[in-house]
């Protein structure tokens, strides 16, 4: 996104008018000999009046009148260039704006107190143009004058990354993340991505945690897909846990057509026929797997009422099996009730699955705070607790509290 140039100094403190002559109020009194002549001052005053009305075309026409005056002083050229940079920027003539900033910075008439704003504007214009050498040039000068904000640090990181100085890019990315957190803001996504890329080989777990921060900010299917794909390789992954991960992929809209085919086949194998139909159809998958899922789904739904009654009286595993079916058919309140029974009774073949299903059923009913607590309470191996952690992130996002960090996954046991 193009950042706005610093307008306050350009308009509020650049020029004041006395008897039709533009006088500059930027120098100390002892240096006030620099003035703008009436011939230059009148069109510049007209430009400033047009700027106040956001009439940029008129402002540019007035600046050109000032530029047409013969025998201008270096100070007059400095003032013209300073105003020109603002007007050209708002006319989206970024090349002219940058040229004007460069000329103002190079002027021997530039007041020292103007340097910070001019460097800031040069940095932003180079950032808008993706001119990495210019970003680095202005960024280093600006950093020597004042602390850089998270976005500026992130832009420097991007510039160094794209000029193949990965080590320096990582340093600025880390600074950007730290500065954002210190200010209570979300870190710039680019800084997180550069950090994650640097961590990928040396510290995969740290890279995954950084990717979680990105997902918390974007909630984009593409970022969810990256995070979920990495998680499939977690130690202890089983078919049941993988299915819970596919369910997450489905609700986050990260499930691709080829993955829908695999997920649907797995759902059929686990006898999650409702899930199989939903997932296969979502991916546009047709053929034997969908036909089988539809046939078995029709049979199962015809006997569900009896199965629910039996599950209420039966074991924890029986309650869990029926709850899984209810979840697949979108009957989330009933799935929640039986999942609670399964948690209470215990005896599941898959430790942690009853608690996991409880959390998923709560999420699908928009009970996000309860769901997060349910996911935190999931026990089991590393894969089970990791998948529960990701579902907890989803609940956190849907509950509107994604600005804070994700809760750490519980240790597997």
Q: Which ranges hold each PLM region?
A:
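N-terminal leader/linker segments that initiate helical-solenoid repeat arrays
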Residues: 2-6, 10, 14, 21-102, ...
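Generic helix N-cap/helix-start motif at coil->alpha-helix transitions
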Residues: 36-45, 74-81, 111-121, 145-155, ...
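Alpha-helical segment of the N-proximal tetratricopeptide repeat
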Residues: 42-58, 317-334
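Residue at a conserved register position within TPR or TPR-like alpha-solenoid repeats
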Residues: 50, 88, 126, 160, ...
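Structural motif corresponding to the intra-repeat A-B loop/turn of tetratricopeptide repeats
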Residues: 53, 91, 129, 163, ...
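Alpha-helical repeat scaffolds
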Residues: 63-65, 95-105, 132-143, 167-179, ...
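Flexible internal linker/loop segments at domain or repeat junctions
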Residues: 289-325, 337
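C-terminal soluble interaction/assembly domains
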Residues: 319-413
